[in-house]
């Protein structure tokens, strides 16, 4: 580097020399002798600024002095002046080079000084990656670690005497984060299963709601038929305890006053303490009560009276006794026949929906299944029992061999001649403890003994065929 500087300055001298001022020649003494210049011993060099100022002043002084003819001694003094100037330049360059080396050494020592590593919280634990080659100007934390023992694996105990460049702060949260990830994954699976289960439950709920809505849809003729049945109780616009007890006694039911009150409380749907026609209609169109009554009649005739189905039992006896007008009988039997068929189809649909849930292996609530399907699930078994009873060889009914279940009674106008109103037969009948076997002939005032009744006459929903016109 010094050689380059010297070459550069020699080239500058070549360009500067033609413009250098002429130096005065040696002075001659008065005695005719030649005066010789004396050079003082070189002392300490002044600073560069002082030298520059002195060099600027020297040419001025040289220009002010009178020029004299140059001689050989002047040429020698010019060479000495050039050599002194080059020495000054070289010394200045050496000082600047040493200056740069010293500052560079200080910067390197400052970079090599140890720094304390502070753990910084990160969003996810990651192992520190050491690059293969890092320049010297990079930060201290990115450089290669000093040669020594290999760093311990993540989470392992590190001795205090050994320097370790690995940050252990994020590694402490690794266990918690694993538990959090497991918890999130379990929540996702549960939410996915729940999301798949909700459409099935909603479909079941909609099916059940549609069934409940269809119960309220009655035609005008059907409503008038149920009103005719309601007027039999002869109450003051409602069914009270006295009227209900009188009808039960006429039908041969032996009930207590507590059972009558329970039946009225069950029929009071709106809870106002009165059983008006609206409550009566809601009870008679209730699908659950209807199927419960059908099941009780199919199982046993000696079953205890159910207060929730007592009105159905009274209606069953009135239909079998032909104690209602012909149009009323036809509308009521057609209504319950349709309800029985719809209940059977809906029970099959409900079973299919539950089967799909089981095939998909999704958890479902069995209690909810029982509460929503108990009446409908037993329809098929009830029908099979009714068929077995109808086809039994010991039955004497002429309708025992009918291959299908029809719910409308056979009304032959030529054989059965009823009076315009047969309520008088109920008014004349007052025996409270009549046997079921003699109950039917007691109400044969208009049929002249042409109809036969047996002990199974209460099963009118399954034993009587439909009317043909």
From Swiss-Prot:
- Pro residues bias spans: 146-157
- Positions of the EF-hand domain: 255-290
Ranges of Low complexity composition bias in the record? 62-73
- Look up keyword Transcription regulation and say if it applies: no
Q: Could you tell me the gene encoding this protein?
A: SPATA21
Q: What are the entry keywords?
A: Calcium, Coiled coil, Metal-binding
Give the protein's function.
Involved in the differentiation of haploid spermatids.
Feature: compositional bias, Basic and acidic residues: 49-61, 450-459
Ribonucleoprotein among keywords = no
Please tell me the species this chain comes from.
Homo sapiens
Q: Where is the composition biased (Polar residues)?
A: 105-132
What is the name listed in the Swiss-Prot or TrEMBL entry for this protein?
Spermatogenesis-associated protein 21
| GO MF, one annotated term | calcium ion binding
Q: InterPro entries of this UniProt entry?
A: EF-hand-dom_pair, EF_Hand_1_Ca_BS, EF_hand_dom, SPT21
Region span, Disordered: 1-76, 99-157, 424-469
Q: Which domain of life is it from?
A: Eukaryota
The UniProt annotation places Ca(2+) binding at: 268, 270, 272, 274, 279
Residues forming coiled coils: 198-225
